[in-house]
Amino acid sequence: MTDNAPRIHPTAVIDPAARLADDVQVGAFTLIGADVEIGAGTVVGPHCSIHGPTRIGRDNRFVGHAAIGGEPQDKKFAGERTELVIGDRNVFREFVTVNRGTGGGGGITTIGNDNWMLAYTHVAHDCHVGNFCVFSNNTTLAGHVTVGDYVIISGFAGAHQFCRIGAHAFLGMGALTNGDVPPFTMVGTDSLGRPRGINSEGLKRRGFDAERISAIKRAYRTLYVAGLPLAEAKQQLTEQARGSDDVKAMLDFIEHAERPLLR
């Protein structure tokens, strides 16, 4: 698209009730429905569909064939008003799908800032994704999944409904988790993913020093290597958390579980 070309392709269909910032670009054959709000600097590529109620922040990029804000894939959904809220500077690659929430699940799906969602990623109804995450090709989140900041999910990996994935966690290629994944943890590629240590390389890249990583490793060994019952492991983590905010974050995550902890 040149500087002199129209920012909205003539084949795009935009509902009069949609609200787009002046500099939003919309590609060929894209559909933008009513009650959609798109912030400044956002680029919507060709053959995309965005349905409302959906709120999209600034400087996002939707590559071809992304389907955003569609109805939840939940038989209990009865047409009630629900929404999708997306923050700033996210990238949605080819054929990504993100669904709105359900009335019974809180009514909202949220995506934070600075996330990369690669081709064929699916984010289901009532999910909540933090900031600076990378979802590789064919990542699948079932309904009501919560993902913390800086999570990396490898290709063809997925999470069972209602699972939580803690900040800085890493899921390997094809890993499927049916339980909560504590912060900093790596999940292997078994038929159902199992913890395989902490995400040391990712933490180093984000500026965690040796002392912080050592404390996280100690907590991981307490939780997964020592063979302790969960209640006893939590007691030891409580002691360790007094000297480490990172261990405290792990303990807080465990204390607020809705699904069984992945062990």
Swiss-Prot record:
The keyword Cytoplasm applies. One of its GO terms (cellular component) is membrane. The keyword ATP-binding does not apply. It is found in: Cytoplasm. Pathway: Glycolipid biosynthesis; lipid IV(A) biosynthesis; lipid IV(A) from (3R)-3-hydroxytetradecanoyl-[acyl-carrier-protein] and UDP-N-acetyl-alpha-D-glucosamine: step 1/6. Gene3D superfamilies: Hexapeptide repeat proteins, Udp N-acetylglucosamine O-acyltransferase, C-terminal domain. InterPro entries: Acetyltransf_C, Acetyltransf_C_sf, Hexapep, Lipid_A_LpxA, Trimer_LpxA-like_sf. GO terms for molecular function: acyl-[acyl-carrier-protein]-UDP-N-acetylglucosamine O-acyltransferase activity. Keywords: Acyltransferase, Cytoplasm, Lipid A biosynthesis, Lipid biosynthesis, Lipid metabolism, Repeat, Transferase. Transmembrane segments: none annotated. It catalyses: a (3R)-hydroxyacyl-[ACP] + UDP-N-acetyl-alpha-D-glucosamine = a UDP-3-O-[(3R)-3-hydroxyacyl]-N-acetyl-alpha-D-glucosamine + holo-[ACP]. Belongs to the transferase hexapeptide repeat family. LpxA subfamily. Involved in the biosynthesis of lipid A, a phosphorylated glycolipid that anchors the lipopolysaccharide to the outer membrane of the cell. Homotrimer. This is Acyl-[acyl-carrier-protein]--UDP-N-acetylglucosamine O-acyltransferase. The gene is lpxA.
